[in-house]
C-alpha cells in the first residue's frame, strides 16, 4: 500500500465517522431513552513522525492543539515540521439509562476502534524505523508500473519496465549485449542490427547481389565474397585459388585460368648410374602433395613402372635395372589428386662388373683369394696387394679360369698384417671396374705360459709376447667342474691375475692374442688354489651363559672346522671341533655380561684356512625380588635385588591403568627408587631392567596402588546473611562421595552433610548473620577417607531497613532508618549528587538518623546507608533527597564557526521546565530559542560570518525565571569552497575555488612536495584559481587554502593534486605510451618487449580510432624515394615526423615473441575522401623466412587488398621473392610483400598514374590512381581507449595531411 493510499483510507473512514455522528440525534434514540441526559465527548489525536528525508509534504496543522478533551501531543511537538496529525472529536449524548447495547452505538464504537487500529498501523509503517531506513522515493509509487515492497524496500516492476522505480522501458533481450537501451529501443553497436541487436549486419548489404540471412550474405549464382561484391571466377578457381573481379589467383602449386592444372616439375636430371640402378633428382616444390615417378626401357612402354615419392624427397634411386640399357624416366607433380604434365629424362645403365671376391684361407704368412668370373668376356686379371699402412704394392697377373671362379694364393706375407687387395678384369689393355677387398694374415700365439702366486681365489699367469701387431690378449680359465671365465689383457702386458677363483680348485688356463676379430692359436697351463676361510662369522641367540655362532661354509673340500673362544679378561679359553657339514655351534659355560672373542677356521689334513673372528657378549641378568612399598597419593617406592653383571644403569618404567607411561633411569649402585607424579587412587604396573650400553636385561615387574587424594582449593563464596557456598577442586581418584562439616565459632554448633561424588560445591544453609564458621571437606570410598580440607565462612551483616528522607532545605536533609540486628561497629552514610559529587560520613552504631550538610541547591541526591563491622559491610539501603533551585552559571561560548556557535553553562540545580537563549548581533538583529531542561548547551545557528553577538541564557519554571547569564560570540571567517584540481598533467594542474561570503583581505595557498618540502603562496582576494607548475610526474601533492582578514584566518579547505604517472615504466608499444597519459601524437621511445635495454623511437598516433598506434609507414609528400635496396627496407629509412619506413627487422621484433596480438590499420586519403582498412592480425616473420607477411580478418571502408599478399615474402629490386616471371619490385618501383604482383602498393612511385606503378590500393582507387596520403600503423588487437587528460604535444596531423 502506498503512502498516499495509507493516508486516503483513514481519512475516508474519519469522514464517514463524522457524518455518522452528525446524524446521531435522529437515529440513536431507542424507545425509553431521553435526550436530556449528560453529554460525553470522545477526542482522539494521532501524530505520525515522518522522516525529513521522505518526499512527503506536510502542511501546518490548521486546528488548535487545545480541545475540550485532553491533548495527546507533548509540548513542542506542534512546532515540528514533519509531523502529520490526525484529530477527530465525537460528541455523544449519553442518556441516564444504560444504552450501551444500542446497535447504532455498538456499530459506531466498532468503526472508531477500526479507525484507531488503521492509524496505529499507518504510524508503525511510516515510522523512521519502518520506512526503509530513509528511502526517499516512496512517493514515486514505482512510477505507476510496479509494486513497492516494504519488506524488501524495492519495486517489483511490470513486464517491459525496469529501473529502481520502474521508470524506464525495458529493451527486448537486453539488446543481446550488443547495444544500449534508450526509452525501450535498442541502439545497436556496430556491426549489430535488429530490434534486439541479435545478429550482425551483412557487409555492404550484400552489394545488391545476394540476400542477408542473420548477418551472412547468401550470394546470387554469379557473385561471391562476404559482401557478394566480387564476380565469380571460372569453376570457382577449382577450389585452388581465390577470385578477384572474375579472375583466378591460384594457390601455389596450381596454374591455369581456373587453377585446375598442377605446375609441371622442373630440373629433372641424372645424378648417378650403375649397371642396375639410376639415381635421379629434381627441383623441390613445397606446394605438392607428392611426386609420381615412372620409368621403362626405351621402346617398351608397356613394361613401365610407377613410384609415389613423398613431397619432402627430391631425389630417387631406381633399382633392379638391366645393365647397359636405355631407360625413359618421367616425373609428375601431384596436388589434391591432380597430376601435372610430365617432365622426361633419357638415361643408360653401366656394363656388368666382377662378382664377389673373398679370402678363402689365411695363415700367418699367406692369403688365398678367390672371385667370381663376370658374364662378359675377360682375357685375364691383374691382382695388386700391399699392407694397408704402407705404400708398397705388388702386382701379379692371374689368368682367367675356365671354372666359374678364379683364385690366387699370395705368399711371403707378415703375420697379423692387414692387406689391401685389388682384382682388375682386363680385356686387352682396357681395364674394367676393379673389385676391392681386404685380407689379414693370422697372428702368432703366445709362448712359455706359466702360473705362480696362487691364493684362495687368485692366480698370476705370464707368457712371452707375440711378434704380430695386436689389440689385446685373451685369457680363459676353466675349473675342474667346467666353470669358465674369460678376460682381456692389454697388448703391452705379458701377465695377468686371475680373480674370482674357487678355493682348493684346479683350473685349466688358455692364453691367445687378438686383433679385431682375428685371434692366434691358444697356449695353455694349470693352476691350483688354496683353501678359503669361513666367512660372515656372526653371534646370535645370546643368553646369560650361552651363545650361538654361525658362519658361511667354505667352498673348498675340507675335513672339519675348529672353534676357539676366549673371555675378555683372558681367564679362560676353550677349543671345540665342528663337523665339516656344520656352519654353526653353541658356546656353553659362559659367564653373564662378559664379552668373548671367537675364532673359527677350516682344516684339511695338515692344511688350514685363515682364521675368522667375532665377539660374543653374554646377556645381563635381570633384577630379582621386585617389590613396592611406602605408597602415598602421588608416589611409591620400588626396590629389587641387584644383578651380578657389570652394568651402566637400571631403567624403571611405570604405566597407569589408563595407559599413561613414564620411564626413569636409576644408578647402577642403587637397588630402589621413588616413583613420583602418580595419580591418586590409581593402579600402576612397574617394570625394572638393567642396561649396559645398548644391551638390556629381561624386565622384572610388580604393581603399585596409590592413596585417594583430598579435595584442593577449598574456598567460600556467595556468602549472604544466612547462607554460604563452598567449592573445591574435585579429587582425581575414584570415590563414593564427599562429606562437608561446618561448625559455628560462636557456640560450637556443628552440622555434617554428604555431597555426591560428581559435585564440587555445596550451599551451607541455616547460618546466622555476622557469625564465622569453620568448614571441613573430605572424600570417601568405602571405609577409606582422604585427608580433610578446611576453610572459614563469615556470614554477612544485615542491612538497615526503612530508610527515609525528611526536613530537606536548599543545603541540608535528614535521613533515618531502622537499626540492624547484627553486632556492628558503626553505620556509614554515603550521598551523591546528580552531577557525581560524593560525600561519606560515619554514624555511631547506637544512632538511627543523621543530618546531611553542605548540599547544593536544586540538586537531587542519592543516599546510601549500610552497617560495618571490621572490614565487613552490610548491603546498602538507599533513598533520594531533592534541594531547591538556582540559576545558570559559567556561561561560555565555544566551538565557534563562520555561521554557528555553541554556548554552554553549568546546569541549575533546581528542577526547571526549560532554558531560554537570546542572541543579538552587533547590528541589532535578535533571535530567541528555547532549550530543553536536560541540556546545558545549545548551538546558535543562522549566524553571519565575522559578526559579534551578545548571548543571554536563563532558566524558567512556569512563570518563574532565573537571573540571566551573558557572554559574547564572535563568528569565524567562512573558508573558500569547492577547491578542486583540474587540467592535471604530468607536471602540473589548475586549482579553482569559490570565494567565501565574508569580507576578506586575501588567501594563503599551501602545497607540500613528496620530499616533505612545503611551499606557501599569498594570493589576492579577487583570485579564484591558481596554476601549479614544475611538479614531479606521478606524485601526490596535498594542497590547502585559507582566507584571511588581518590576523584572522578561515578554516583550511584541502584537496590533493596527483600528477599523471607512468603506468608502464618501459612501454612496449604506443598503447602503453598512451596509458601513461600521453594524449598527443608524436615521437616517443618504446622498449621492445618491455626490455629497458632495447629502446626504439617510434611515431605514435594517439588520435585515430582511440589512438595507441605505432606508425610504421607514411607517404604524404613524395619527397622521399621508396625505391630502395633490401638492406634499406630491413633497417628502415626516412624521418618518422615526415615520410618514412620503420624497417622489417623492427616490425619482426615488434610483432613476434610477445604475448600481444597486433592488428594493422591502413589509412588512405585524397583531397576530398578518406578510407581505412583494418586486419585483426598482423605479423612479420624473421629474415630467415624473408620477412613473410601474415594478416588476419579484414574490416573497413577501403576494401580488402592485403589478404592477397598474406603469406608472401618481402621483395625489393635486388632481392626477388615473388612468384611473378619478372621482379615485381623492379616493375612496380617499390618494396612490398609482392605475389604476382599486387593489389596494394603503398611503397610505389609517388604520384605515378601508370598501371600498378603508383601508390595503389586497388579495391579503393584501382591500379591507375596514386593515393597522395597513406599511413600504416599497428597496435594490440582489441585495444580501445577513451580520450585521456595529459600534456598536449604539438601534432603533425594537419601538416602531414596537407597534399
Swiss-Prot record:
The keyword Repeat applies. Glycans are attached at residue 1149. InterPro entries: ECM_Regulatory_Proteins, EGF-like_dom, Fibrinogen-like_C, Fibrinogen_a/b/g_C_1, Fibrinogen_a/b/g_C_dom, Fibrinogen_CS, FN3_dom, FN3_sf. It holds the Pfam family EGF_Teneurin. One of its GO terms (molecular function) is integrin binding. This is Tenascin-N. GO terms for biological process: axonogenesis; cell-matrix adhesion; dendrite self-avoidance; negative regulation of neuron migration; neuron projection extension; osteoblast development; positive regulation of neuron projection development; positive regulation of sprouting angiogenesis. Residues 264-352, 353-444, 445-532, 533-623, 624-709, 710-800, 801-886, 887-976, 977-1063 form the Fibronectin type-III domain. Not detected in normal adult mammary tissues or brain but expressed in most breast tumors and brain tumors, such as glioblastomas, astrocytomas and oligodendrogliomas, tested. In brain tumors, detected around the endothelial cell layer of the clood vessels. Gene3D superfamilies: Gamma Fibrinogen, chain A, domain 1, Immunoglobulins, Laminin. Its main location: secreted.
Amino acid at each position: 500500500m502506498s503512502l498516499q493510499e495509507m493516508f486516503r483510507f483513514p481519512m475516508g473512514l474519519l469522514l464517514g465517522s463524522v457524518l455518522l455522528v452528525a446524524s446521531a440525534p435522529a437515529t440513536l434514540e431507542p424507545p425509553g431513552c431521553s435526550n436530556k441526559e449528560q453529554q460525553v465527548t470522545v477526542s482522539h489525536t494521532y501524530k505520525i513522525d515522518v522522516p525529513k528525508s521522505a518526499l512527503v509534504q506536510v502542511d501546518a496543522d490548521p486546528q488548535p492543539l487545545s480541545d475540550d478533551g485532553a491533548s495527546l501531543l507533548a509540548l513542542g511537538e506542534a512546532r515540528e515540521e514533519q509531523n502529520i496529525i490526525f484529530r477527530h472529536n465525537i460528541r455523544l449524548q449519553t442518556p441516564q439509562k444504560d444504552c450501551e447495547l444500542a446497535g447504532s452505538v455498538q456499530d459506531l464504537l466498532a468503526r472508531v476502534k477500526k479507525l484507531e487500529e488503521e492509524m496505529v498501523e499507518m504510524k508503525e509503517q511510516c515510522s523512521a524505523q519502518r520506512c526503509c531506513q530513509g528511502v526517499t522515493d516512496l512517493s514515486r509509487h514505482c512510477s505507476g508500473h510496479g509494486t513497492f515492497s516494504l519488506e524488501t524496500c524495492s519495486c517489483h516492476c511490470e513486464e517491459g519496465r525496469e529501473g529502481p522505480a520502474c521508470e524506464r522501458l525495458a529493451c527486448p533481450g537486453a539488446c543481446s549485449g550488443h547495444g544500449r537501451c534508450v526509452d525501450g529501443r535498442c541502439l545497436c553497436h556496430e556491426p549489430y542490427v535488429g530490434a534486439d541487436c541479435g545478429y550482425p549486419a551483412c557487409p555492404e548489404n550484400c552489394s545488391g547481389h545476394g540476400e542477408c540471412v542473420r548477418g551472412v550474405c547468401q550470394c546470387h549464382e554469379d557473385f561471391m565474397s562476404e559482401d557478394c561484391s566480387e564476380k565469380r571466377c571460372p569453376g570457382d578457381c577449382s577450389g585452388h585459388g581465390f577470385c578477384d573481379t572474375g579472375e583466378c589467383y591460384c594457390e601455389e602449386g596450381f596454374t591455369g585460368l581456373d587453377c585446375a592444372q598442377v605446375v609441371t616439375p622442373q630440373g629433372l636430371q641424372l645424378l648417378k648410374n650403375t649397371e642396375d640402378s639410376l639415381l635421379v633428382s629434381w627441383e623441390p616444390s613445397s606446394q605438392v602433395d607428392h611426386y609420381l615417378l615412372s620409368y621403362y626401357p626405351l621402346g617398351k612402354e608397356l613394361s613401365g613402372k610407377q613410384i609415389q615419392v613423398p613431397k619432402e624427397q627430391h631425389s630417387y634411386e631406381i633399382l633392379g635395372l638391366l645393365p647397359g640399357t636405355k631407360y625413359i624416366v618421367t616425373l609428375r607433380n601431384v596436388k589434391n589428386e591432380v597430376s601435372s604434365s610430365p617432365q622426361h629424362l633419357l638415361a643408360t645403365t653401366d656394363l656388368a662388373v666382377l662378382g664377389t671376391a673373398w679370402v678363402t684361407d689365411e695363415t700367418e704368412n699367406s692369403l688365398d683369394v678367390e672371385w667370381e668370373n663376370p658374364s662378359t668376356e675377360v682375357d685375364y686379371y691383374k691382382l695388386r696387394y700391399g699392407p694397408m699402412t704402407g705404400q708398397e704394392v705388388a702386382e701379379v697377373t692371374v689368368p682367367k679360369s675356365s671354372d666359374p671362379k678364379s683364385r690366387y694364393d699370395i705368399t711371403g706375407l707378415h703375420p697379423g698384417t692387414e692387406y689391401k687387395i685389388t682384382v682388375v678384369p682386363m680385356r686387352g689393355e682396357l681395364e674394367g671396374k676393379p673389385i676391392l677387398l681386404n685380407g689379414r694374415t693370422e697372428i702368432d700365439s703366445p709362448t712359455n705360459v706359466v702360473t705362480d702366486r696362487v691364493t684362495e681365489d687368485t692366480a698370476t699367469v705370464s707368457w712371452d709376447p707375440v711378434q704380430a701387431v695386436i689389440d689385446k690378449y685373451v685369457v680363459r680359465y676353466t675349473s675342474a667342474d667346467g666353470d669358465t671365465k674369460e678376460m682381456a689383457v692389454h697388448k703391452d702386458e705379458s701377465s695377468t691375475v686371475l680373480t674370482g677363483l674357487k678355493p682348493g680348485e684346479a683350473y685349466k688356463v688358455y692364453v691367445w692374442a687378438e686383433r679385431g676379430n682375428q685371434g692366434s692359436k691358444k697356449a695353455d697351463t694349470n693352476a691350483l688354489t688354496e683353501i678359503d676361510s669361513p666367512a660372515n662369522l656372526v653371534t646370535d641367540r645370546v643368553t646369560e651363559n650361552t651363545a650361538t655362532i654361525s658362519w658361511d661354509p667354505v667352498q673348498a673340500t675340507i675335513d672339519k672346522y675348529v672353534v676357539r673362544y676366549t673371555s675378555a679378561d683372558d681367564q679362560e679359553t676353550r677349543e671345540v671341533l665342528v663337523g665339516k657339514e656344520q656352519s654353526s655351534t653353541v658356546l656353553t659355560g659362559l659367564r653373564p655380561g662378559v664379552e668373548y672373542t671367537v675364532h673359527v677356521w677350516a682344516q684339511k689334513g695338515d692344511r688350514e684356512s685363515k682364521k675368522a673372528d667375532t665377539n660374543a657378549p653374554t646377556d645381563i641378568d635381570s633384577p630379582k625380588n621386585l617389590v613396592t612399598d611406602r605408597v602415598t597419593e602421588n608416589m611409591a617406592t620400588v626396590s629389587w635385588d641387584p644383578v651380578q653383571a657389570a652394568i651402566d644403569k637400571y631403567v624403571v618404567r611405570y604405566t597407569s591403568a589408563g595407559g599413561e607411561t613414564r620411564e626413569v633411569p636409576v644408578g647402577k649402585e642403587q637397588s630402589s627408587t621413588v616413583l613420583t607424579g602418580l595419580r591418586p587412587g590409581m593402579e600402576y604396573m612397574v617394570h625394572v631392567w638393567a642396561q649396559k650400553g645398548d644391551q638390556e636385561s629381561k624386565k622384572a615387574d610388580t604393581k603399585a596402588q596409590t592413596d585417594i587424594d583430598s579435595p584442593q582449593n577449598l574456598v567460600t563464596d556467595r556468602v549472604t546473611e544466612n547462607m554460604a557456598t563452598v567449592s573445591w577442586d574435585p579429587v582425581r581418584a575414584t570415590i563414593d562421595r564427599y562429606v562437608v562439616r561446618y561448625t559455628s565459632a560462636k557456640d560450637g554448633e556443628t552440622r555434617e552433610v554428604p555431597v555426591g561424588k560428581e559435585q564440587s560445591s555445596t550451599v551451607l544453609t541455616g547460618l546466622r548473620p555476622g557469625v564465622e564458621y569453620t568448614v571441613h571437606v573430605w572424600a570417601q570410598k568405602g571405609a577409606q577417607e582422604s585427608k580433610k580440607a578446611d576453610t572459614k565462612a563469615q556470614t554477612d551483616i544485615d542491612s538497615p531497613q526503612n530508610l527515609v528522607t525528611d526536613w530537606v532545605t536548599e543545603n541540608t536533609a535528614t535521613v533515618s532508618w531502622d537499626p540492624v540486628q547484627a553486632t556492628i561497629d558503626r553505620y556509614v552514610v554515603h550521598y551523591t549528587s546528580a552531577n557525581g559529587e560524593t560525600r561519606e560520613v560515619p554514624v555511631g552504631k547506637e544512632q538511627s538518623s543523621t543530618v546531611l550538610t553542605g548540599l547544593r541547591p536544586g540538586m537531587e541526591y542519592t543516599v546510601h546507608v549500610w552497617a560495618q563491622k571490621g572490614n565487613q559491610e552490610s548491603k546498602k539501603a538507599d533513598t533520594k533527597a531533592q534541594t531547591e533551585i538556582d540559576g545558570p552559571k559559567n556561561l561560555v561560548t565555544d566551538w565557534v564557526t563562520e555561521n554557528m556557535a555553541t554556548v554552554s553553562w553549568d546546569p541549575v540545580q533546581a528542577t526547571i521546565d526549560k532554558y531560554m537563549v537570546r542572541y543579538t548581533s552587533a547590528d541589532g538583529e535578535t533571535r530567541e530559542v528555547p532549550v530543553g531542561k536536560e541540556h546545558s548547551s545549545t548551538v546558535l545557528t543562522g549566524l553571519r560570518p565575522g559578526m559579534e553577538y551578545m548571548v543571554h541564557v536563563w532558566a524558567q519554571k512556569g512563570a518563574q525565571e532565573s537571573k540571566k547569564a551573558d557572554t559574547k560570540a564572535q563568528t569565524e571567517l567562512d573558508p573558500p569552497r569547492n577547491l578542486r584540481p583540474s587540467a592535471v598533467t604530468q607536471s602540473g594542474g589548475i586549482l579553482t575555488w569559490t570565494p567565501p561570503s565574508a569580507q576578506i583581505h586575501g588567501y594563503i595557498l599551501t602545497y607540500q612536495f613528496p620530499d616533505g618540502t612545503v611551499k606557501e603562496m599569498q594570493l589576492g582576494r579577487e583570485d579564484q584559481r591558481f596554476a601549479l607548475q614544475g611538479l614531479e610526474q606521478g606524485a601526490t601533492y596535498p594542497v590547502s587554502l585559507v582566507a584571511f582578514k588581518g590576523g584572522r584566518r578561515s578554516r583550511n579547505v584541502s584537496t590533493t593534486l596527483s600528477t599523471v604517472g607512468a603506468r608502464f615504466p618501459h612501454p612496449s608499444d604506443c598503447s602503453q605510451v598512451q596509458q601513461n597519459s600521453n594524449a598527443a601524437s608524436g615521437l616517443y621511445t618504446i622498449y621492445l618487449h618491455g626490455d629497458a635495454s632495447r629502446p626504439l623511437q617510434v611515431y605514435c598516433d594517439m588520435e585515430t580510432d582511440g589512438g595507441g598506434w605505432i606508425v610504421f609507414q607514411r607517404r604524404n609528400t613524395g619527397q622521399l624515394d621508396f625505391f630502395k635496396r633490401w638492406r634499406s627496407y630491413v633497417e628502415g629509412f626516412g624521418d618518422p615526423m615526415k615520410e618514412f619506413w620503420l624497417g622489417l627487422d623492427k616490425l619482426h621484433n615488434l610483432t613476434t615473441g610477445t604475448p600481444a596480438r597486433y592488428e594493422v590499420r591502413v589509412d588512405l586519403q585524397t583531397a576530398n575522401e578518406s578510407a581505412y582498412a583494418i586486419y585483426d592480425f598482423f605479423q612479420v616473420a624473421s629474415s630467415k623466412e624473408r620477412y613473410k607477411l601474415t594478416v588476419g580478418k579484414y574490416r573497413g571502408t577501403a576494401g580488402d587488398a592485403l589478404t592477397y599478399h598474406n603469406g608472401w615474402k618481402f621483395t625489393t629490386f635486388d632481392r626477388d621473392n615473388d612468384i611473378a616471371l619478372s621482379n615485381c619490385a623492379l616493375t612496380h618501383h617499390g618494396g612490398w610483400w609482392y605475389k604476382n604482383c599486387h593489389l596494394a602498393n603503398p611503397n610505389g612511385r609517388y604520384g605515378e598514374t601508370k598501371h600498378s606503378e603508383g601508390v595503389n590500393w586497388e579495391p579503393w582507387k584501382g591500379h591507375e590512381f596514386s593515393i597522395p596520403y597513406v599511413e600504416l600503423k599497428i597496435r594490440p588487437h582489441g585495444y580501445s581507449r577513451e580520450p585521456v587528460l595529459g600534456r598536449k604535444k604539438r601534432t603533425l596531423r594537419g601538416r602531414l595531411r596537407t597534399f
